[in-house]
A protein has these predicted regions:
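Rossmann-like dinucleotide-binding core of oxidoreductases
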Residues: 109-170
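Rossmann-fold NAD(P)-binding glycine/threonine-rich loop
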Residues: 89-112
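A short helix->loop->beta-strand "cap" motif at the edges of active sites that frequently abuts
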Residues: 24, 82-85, 106-108
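NAD(P)-binding Rossmann-fold cofactor-contacting core
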Residues: 25-40
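Hydrophobic/small residue at the entry helix of a nucleotide-binding pocket
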Residues: 11
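Beta-loop-alpha module in the N-terminal Rossmann-like domain of NAD(P)-dependent dehydrogenases
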Residues: 62-79, 92-96
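Conserved N-terminal Rossmann-fold NAD(P)-binding element of oxidoreductases
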Residues: 3-7
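Rossmann-fold cofactor-recognition segment
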Residues: 41-51
């Protein structure tokens, strides 16, 4: 299976890592900058979603976007047009609604807003349940970057671990 991961920041790296752990996939990455040496990808392209060749996506069985939210619609519409399953990390409810409406009208598969949590954390919890010898009745999940030691430092007065893109946050 050929999987494309667009955006190779922190979340893109994590997605590529998990794909390596979960299966034998051929992983393509695409970003507007060169890949760093820690990225475990099979192929990397430096590209701009807005200037992508019309048929570039056709070799992929799945496209995952870890791009900033304002680029998701552009990529999603191209995937929808080519009937390539698409998912993203979200970041904007109006963008996700636009993507979902387009997918419904063209009967294409999309999953939007699969960010850290809810989203990726839920997927990993389900995978853990599938691999446990006895399945518990409930899973309790917490999300947040707040450390247990809440004493602020001069370096970071909020003492908060930023695990997601703040693009579009007001």
């Amino acid at each position: 299976m050929n999987i494309a991961v667009f955006g190779t920041g922190q979340m893109g790296h994590a997605i590529v890592y998990m794909l390596r752990q979960l299966g034998n996939y051929t992983i393509y990455t695409c970003d507007n900058r060169a890949a760093d040496s820690n990225l475990m990808t099979d192929y990397h392209s430096v590209c701009d979603v807005k200037d992508m060749e019309h048929d570039y996506l056709q070799k992929f069985d799945l496209v995952i976007s870890s791009l900033p939210y304002y680029l998701n619609n552009e990529l999603a519409q191209k995937c929808i047009e080519h009937k390539i399953p698409y998912c993203d990390l979200g970041g904007s409810v109006p963008v996700s609604k636009t993507i979902n409406q387009s997918a419904k009208s063209l009967k294409s598969t999309v999953f939007t807003d699969l960010g850290l949590a809810p989203g990726w954390a839920n997927i990993m919890a389900e995978q853990a349940l599938l691999e446990l010898p006895s399945v518990p009745h409930t899973v309790k999940m917490r999300c947040g970057g707040l450390p247990s030691d809440i004493a602020p430092s001069n370096k970071d007065p909020f003492n908060y671990k930023l695990t997601w893109s703040i693009d579009g946050l007001y």
